[in-house]
Regions:
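Flexible gly/pro-rich beta->alpha loop and the following alpha-helix that scaffold active-site loops
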Residues: 72-129
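Short glycine-rich anion-binding loops that position phosphate/pyrophosphate groups of nucleotides
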Residues: 34-36, 106-108, 136
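C-terminal and late-domain segments of enzyme folds
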Residues: 1-24, 30-57, 146, 150-239
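Class I SAM-dependent methyltransferase SAM-binding "motif I" and its flanking Rossmann-like core
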Residues: 110-116, 120-176
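General beta-strand structural signal in soluble alpha/beta enzymes
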Residues: 5, 78-79, 102-103, 131-133, ...
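Structural motif
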Residues: 29, 100-104, 131-132, 169-170
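Class I S-adenosyl-L-methionine
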Residues: 38, 52-91
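Short amphipathic alpha-helical segments and helix-helix/interface helices
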Residues: 19, 64, 91-92, 117-124, ...
């Protein structure tokens, strides 16, 4: 399995290793599992928000554009509707040869909850390529955490999909935000051996079979043991 994890998917068309995977037969499956339950709560919401015909609230083309720019044919893009698609159909779509599975932004805990709810974890583990954006970049790890922002009142740790161990990913990092540092400290106290990748917008990490093979505009934090619990920036804008 190869994972492309990023804060914003617009950078995908600039990642040569990603573009090299794509041809006219490449298929994209969008799993809209991350959205707030008041935003998408029924089949009609999926159809409306992912309508290919223009409407003020459709996010289909904005969601698909980075993949189309990277070379995917729009006709090869499928949006899963968990309210109408049966599980056998979803599993078939996810595991076809030459298929990219996309986990979009939103709420990472919702991704995990829905994948478990629809009994898709073993299927997800069989996927060849997964792209995770924002919330979707956090869910693949054994554990992930959120920190205080407009969506969360405070730090909170969640169990992830356990596709990758020994590390975790934090998107949309601005180094001037004091909450990210305190959240990193709290997480490292609980999980000392875990590497934390903090990606600015445009940053990404590529992981293949549990090994990091590519990194760009990402800060990596570790626990400094000899001087107590503190966070130290050890990699900055490594290309």
């Amino acid at each position: 399995m190869k994972l492309y994890l990023t804060s914003v998917s617009s950078c995908l068309s600039e990642i040569e290793s990603f573009k090299s995977l794509i041809n006219r037969q490449t298929k994209l499956v969008i799993l809209p599992f991350s959205y707030h339950k008041e935003y998408i709560k029924c089949a009609e919401d999926i159809w409306y928000h992912f309508d290919r015909e223009p409407n003020p609230d459709s996010i289909f083309w904005a969601t698909a554009r980075p993949f189309i720019d990277a070379g995917i044919d729009p006709n090869n893009i499928t949006v899963i509707n968990q309210y109408t698609d049966n599980i056998a159909y979803i599993k078939y779509k996810l595991t076809r040869e030459n298929t990219i599975v996309y986990l979009p932004g939103g709420y990472p805990e919702n991704i995990v909850e829905n994948i478990m709810k629809y009994d898709l974890l073993d299927t997800i583990k069989q996927c060849e390529i997964i792209v995770g954006e924002s919330a979707g970049s956090m869910a693949p790890f054994k554990e992930f955490f959120v920190y205080k922002d407009q969506d969360y009142a405070d730090y909170k740790k969640f169990k992830g999909l356990n596709l990758v161990k020994g590390m975790t990913f934090v998107p949309h990092v601005t180094l001037s935000n004091p909450f990210i540092f305190s959240a990193c400290r709290r997480f490292k106290k609980q999980r000392r051996k875990t590497i934390i990748f903090c990606a600015m917008d445009g940053g990404y990490v590529v992981i293949e079979d549990g090994t990091v093979i590519e990194i760009h505009d990402v800060y990596t934090f570790e626990l400094k043991r000899k001087k107590g619990i503190r966070i130290r920036d050890i990699i900055s804008s490594l290309r």
